[in-house]
């Protein structure tokens, strides 16, 4: 995740996800709706990996009384979140750090979008357990990120489709084959079955797939009682 401390990479961030993630605005909208099923009008929502601020802005606009806390390890990305939020920024609390930086209080819901695929299996499990520890029983967690089949040929095929989507949206890719191989080797990608297993190990129940777009998958799950 070192690129998120690169000022030029950070400057490109607000445009990049829109061209790389199919239906990003709809993903934010659906995430908010899934949270809204359980989060009260003045509820507390924890956003892990909040740098950039795109989902924070979507939630702040749609649910003006939610108390939003965004956590991210990258100071430049948090600065970008402030810019993205604009006049909404005073309504959002931002913390630099990983999940451990978030206060150990009971939130009404949590979100983690486009973040978990940067974490190893052990780091993901730890992050999910810490998220569970900060949620009220029955509270929703919404997460979405890259998740591809485990078989090498299937993994490369789906990553190829993702890269094709990027390039069709004008994202410059000098060598698609090299990009595909780099993603396969550098990102600790998990298959959907492993993702669900991690949720269960971390203490989440009733997991449901709500979003699938090429390599991206999104789940909602609920903190166990």
Residue ranges, per PLM feature:
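Conserved class I S-adenosyl-L-methionine
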Residues: 1-40, 142-168
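Class I SAM-dependent methyltransferase SAM/SAH-binding core
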Residues: 44-46, 52-101
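A short acidic, Gly/Pro-enriched loop at the edge of an enzyme's catalytic core
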Residues: 102-110
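A short beta-strand submotif of the Rossmann-like class I SAM-dependent methyltransferase core
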Residues: 112-115
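A short glycine-rich, Lys/Arg-flanked "PGG" loop and its adjoining helix->strand segment in the class I
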Residues: 125-137
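Short alpha-helix
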Residues: 185-202
């Amino acid at each position: 995740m070192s690129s998120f401390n690169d000022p030029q990479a950070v400057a490109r961030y607000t445009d990049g996800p829109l061209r790389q993630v199919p239906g990003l605005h709809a993903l934010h909208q659906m995430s908010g709706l899934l949270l809204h099923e359980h989060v009260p009008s003045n509820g507390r929502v924890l956003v892990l990996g909040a740098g950039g601020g795109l989902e924070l802005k979507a939630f702040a606009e749609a649910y003006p009384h939610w108390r939003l806390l965004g956590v991210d390890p990258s100071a430049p990305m948090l600065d970008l979140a402030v810019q993205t939020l604009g006049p909404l920024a005073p309504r959002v609390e931002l913390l630099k750090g990983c999940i451990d930086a978030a206060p150990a209080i009971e939130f009404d819901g949590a979100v983690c979008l486009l973040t978990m695929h940067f974490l190893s299996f052990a780091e993901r499990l730890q992050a999910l357990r810490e998220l569970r520890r900060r949620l009220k029983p029955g509270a929703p967690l919404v997460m979405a990120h890259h998740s591809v089949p485990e078989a090498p040929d299937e993994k490369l095929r789906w990553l190829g489709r993702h890269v094709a989507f990027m390039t069709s949206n004008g994202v410059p890719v000098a060598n698609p084959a090299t990009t595909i191989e780099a993603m396969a080797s550098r990102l600790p990608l998990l298959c959907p079955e492993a993702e669900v297993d991690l949720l269960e190990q971390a203490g989440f129940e009733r997991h449901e797939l709500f979003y699938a777009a090429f390599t991206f998958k999104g789940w909602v799950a609920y903190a166990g009682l």
